[in-house]
Amino acid sequence: MFKNYREILALPGALRFSMAGLVARMPIAVLGLGIVLFIQGVTGSYGLAGIVAAVYMIVQALTGPVIARLVDRRGQATVMVPIVVTHLIALSLLIVSVYLDWWVGLTFVFAGIGGATVGSVGSLVRSRWSHLVTSPRQLQTAFSWESVADEL
């Protein structure tokens, strides 16, 4: 069993993009909770925290297919590099806006921009596997590996 995983991870670039995908997936699952805990901790308001987190997650759900389509048309690096940079800036500004007690509307704007700039990392990595491997058996093994990575 492990032989098959070693075989696909030995392919050129496979270990690098698979590990990058693993690291990139980690914060996605807990970011909504992190927003709630941070904002509640700073402001004392679960209501504000929940609304800001909801804005982030709803915008993420609405824009995910748009980002996926752009990636399909223009390529991963062309689309994702500016999106990741924008995401980091938006989340940083969200933190600053809450911590420095800026106008709450800006917090919603930064949450929306942060949510709008989240790519589907699992899909991006699986797409790379589809282009890298040559046999259906290897592809099945690669997707199995990615399923395990999704659960970590």
Regions found by a protein language model. Give the residues of each.
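Helix-to-loop junctions at the C-terminal end of transmembrane segments
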Residues: 62-76
